[in-house]
Amino acid sequence: MNQRTGQAGAGRTEIPATAAVCGLCCDVCSLFLATHEDPERLTLLAARMGWEVEDARCDGCRAERRTPYCRSCVLLACAERRGHTFCRECSDYPCPQLEDFQRERPHRAELHQNLDRIAEVGADAWLAEVKDRYTCPSCGALNSCYDLKCRKCGHEPSSAFVAAHRAVIVESLRPPVA
């Protein structure tokens, strides 16, 4: 299987480009949302990352067009090397690389639950569930975990995910103390 494009081999179903091997849903990534819905926000995010706008455009971890960070993902490279569709399929799961990756940022808080759910219901059904978890209860807009308020209507919290993890998200957004 070509992990990057989601092309499946004989007898296997196609994996959506936005279902990352680690259990992240790219549809709710700030860069993915900006790529597909908000060019102005994409410009701001690219500047913050020190990238050209074109480099910040992303169609998902399994797509051809990915950010520099996603193009160099060690988890995707490992899964491709071992022939796995998701990290949970590996005999080394959960490995130190995945554990470290999860601890680094709040949007990764539910990786293990996500991977378990993918195994239970499949990638397509899981993606629908995750999108629901990141949807504004007021207007139905999809938000990233870093959108404390809905990016469309301003409702707070922007989603069930933000409601559950607000404290750690807020802490991660604070500038480092000098």
Residue ranges and their predicted role:
Residues 100, 162-172:
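Short metal-binding segments enriched for Cys and/or His
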Residues 58, 87, 136-139, 150-153:
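Short cysteine-rich clusters marking metal-coordination/redox-active sites
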Residues 79, 136-143:
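Short Cys/His-rich zinc-binding micro-motifs
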Residues 12, 20, 155, 175-178:
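Amphipathic, glycine/alanine/valine-rich membrane-attaching segments
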Residues 78, 95, 154-164:
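Short Cys/His-rich micro-motifs in 6-15 aa windows
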Residues 2-122, 132:
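Hydrophobic scaffolds flanking metal-cofactor catalytic centers in soluble metalloenzymes
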